[in-house]
């Protein structure tokens, strides 16, 4: 009887808390690390300079906990420029961006000259996010976020974000790009899904197209780029938005197809980013964050 009453109480709580919707069984692991820190450390010539660098890193680590808390997360570890945290899906990107901005601001005085390019290297923070199922063994989830961070750190120039989406069925996809590019593009894609301006099926048809073309980059495709771009435009144009009740607007078709036509991203990248954005949009909607993010 006690168990039955507890289950009823839990059901009632979930109905109120989630407005009758089922809570999303996924959460985000965040792992972040400073870029080019070895070079920056080596450039400090005096004891005082090393002390000041250590002080700045310690200051950033102390700021990590309130930042993660602000975005409804839980800090697991913060030491120097390393951060590991748990976050809900609808705040993870914003939290990672706040951490990256804070790190860049705190470390701004430690710009160094790259001897190979003769250009200034500004301290930056790259982050990996892993969207994982709550029943997935933690060891697997930690490995996923480590690989996401590694992906971000492999991006030229770094100052990057990478997101790995791992589905319970075993499928996994990773997207990555620099701050100010990938995060802004995802924000636009999320808006499209929240406003029902694009069909989820379009993203999966683009993925099928990429697989058919047997490559993730334009150099691997066996069709002319113009033909690929035309097929992307055709797929986007014939898929209905708003749950099949209206056509996808010409502006949306143009904005998405232009990304491929201008070779900013490949067909596979566009498909993967749309699929990840769709998952994030579901979390935003459930959290009631459609209008303010």
Where are these regions (language model features)?
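Charged, helix-rich terminal subdomains or tails
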Residues: 1-81, 85-293
């Amino acid at each position: 009887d006690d168990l039955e009453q507890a289950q009823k109480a839990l059901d009632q709580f979930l109905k109120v808390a989630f407005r009758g919707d089922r809570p999303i069984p996924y959460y985000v692991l965040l792992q972040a690390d400073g870029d080019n820190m070895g070079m920056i450390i080596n450039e400090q010539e005096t004891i005082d300079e090393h002390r000041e660098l250590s002080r700045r890193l310690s200051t950033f680590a102390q700021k990590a906990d309130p930042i993660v808390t602000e975005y409804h997360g839980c800090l697991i570890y913060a030491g120097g420029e390393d951060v590991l945290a748990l976050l809900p899906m609808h705040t993870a990107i914003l939290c990672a961006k706040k951490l990256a901005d804070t790190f860049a601001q705190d470390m701004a005085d430690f710009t160094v000259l790259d001897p190979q390019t003769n250009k200034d290297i500004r301290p930056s923070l790259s982050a990996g996010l892993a969207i994982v199922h709550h029943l997935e063994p933690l060891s697997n989830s930690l490995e996923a976020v480590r690989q996401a961070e590694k992906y971000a750190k492999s991006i030229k120039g770094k100052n990057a974000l990478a997101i790995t989406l791992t589905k319970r069925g075993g499928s996994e996809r990773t997207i990555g790009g620099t701050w100010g590019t990938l995060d802004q593009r995802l924000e636009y894609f999320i808006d499209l899904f929240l406003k029902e301006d694009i069909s989820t099926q379009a993203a999966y048809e683009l993925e099928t197209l990429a697989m058919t073309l047997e490559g993730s980059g334009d150099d691997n495709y066996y069709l002319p780029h113009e033909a690929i771009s035309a097929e992307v435009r055709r797929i986007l144009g014939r898929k209905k938005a708003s749950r099949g009740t209206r056509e996808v607007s010409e502006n949306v078709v143009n904005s998405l197809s232009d990304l491929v036509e201008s070779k900013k991203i490949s067909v596979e990248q566009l498909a993967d980013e749309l699929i990840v954005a769709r998952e994030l949009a579901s979390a935003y909607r459930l959290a009631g964050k459609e209008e303010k993010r």
